[in-house]
Amino acid sequence: MWVGRPGSEALRKAFGGKPDKAPKVGRKGKGKATIDTPIEPIVLATANVSGVLPGREGSPVLVVGAHMDHLGEGTSSSLAPGVKAIHNGADDNASGVAVILEIARVLGALPVAERPYTVCFVAFGAEEMGLLGSKHYVENLPPALRGRMVAMLNFDMVGRLGSEQDLVIAGMGTSSVWPELVERTRGTQEIRTSDDGYGASDQTSFYEAGLPVLHFFTGTHSDYHKPSDDVDKINFAGAATVADIALRVLHAISTEGIMPDYIKVARTAPARGGFKVSLGTIPDYGAKVDGVRLTGVREGGAAAKAGLRKGDVIQRIGEREVHNLDDYMATFAVLEPGKEVEVAVEREGKPVTVTLVPDAPSRR
């Protein structure tokens, strides 16, 4: 048991400044102890930053958002444990903020006649703490504005588009208009899609409130939630491509008078903070493989302890086959902390099986 300075001082005083008078504690046997300690909660203020680009009076409203917070000098979410260093979050999520600023710049230069819909731009705070900023935004919308909203586009980690990182657009199943609209606006850019409107980013808050959503994302990587996620690794041309596709989507919705319908899609994964277990894996969301390829594993996590490593392709967890990310995320609902499970992977073309013991998720 670790005792801090205040506690050690209290113990010293309790025994008259003579630690040798304290009762001896053996290594065997059972015992009980009661400790009372004052806990003072720390409450910090955060904020969302928003701006409105008006369209025609009373026009439908589109929301374009990205979270602007990151991890400071590292929190329990850092994947560089024990390292106290600024986590700049160039990809997560300065890249998303840069994209929405570029979209605002381009749309703002158009005459009102060419932007018949109103666009709300929002940089959300406290996303890393559990989507708190976007939840607050949605829950506190004026009814008149909420009633005019027709869709939300979210940008989270869009700075690594490249030969090994595809553009993933999630939320395609949240409206019947998305598949055709995205297909004709993506140009020559290859994309991967997911129907799910839920996920560990701010589109979830809007989807839960009944809005169709699209989430733009270029995948995780070995710098995710580490100090090494810095500007020198950003693909600026790739981020511009993401912005260009989003602009075409927004322009088509606005000028063609499209009113995206809302479709409730079955949730394939728990929301952020809702997982029963932590595996310590970093999936490659853009990999085109049968299974789930890992871009890394968290040091000291369950996957690392089991011997999993970067490049492994997970193909089975327990009795469940894993062909894609949806299969992978579905296993989280049946795994239990501390209960062994067999994980089959492909490693450098060869089958490998390991025994993994899931951890309980860390709590902030």
Describe every region a protein language model picked out:
Residues V112-A126, M152-F155, E256-G273:
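Acidic/histidine-enriched alpha-helical segments
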Residues S254-R364:
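C-terminal recognition in membrane/secretory proteostasis and scaffolding
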Residues W2-P6, P41, A90-A98, E128-L132, ...:
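Soluble non-cytosolic domains of exported or imported proteins
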Residues V3, A98, R105, S222-R267:
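His/Asp/Glu-rich mid-to-C-terminal helical/loop segments that flank catalytic regions of hydrolases
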Residues P38-L44, S194-Y198, A271-G273:
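Short Gly/Pro-enriched turn/cap motifs at secondary-structure boundaries
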Residues M1-G89, E102-R105, A109-P116, E139:
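Soluble metallo-hydrolase cores and metallopeptidase-like ectodomains found primarily
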Residues M1-K28, G58, V112, F124-H221, ...:
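Metal-dependent peptidase/peptidase-like ectodomains
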Residues A14, V61-L62, E73-S78, L131-K135, ...:
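Short, solvent-exposed loop/turn and secondary-structure capping segments
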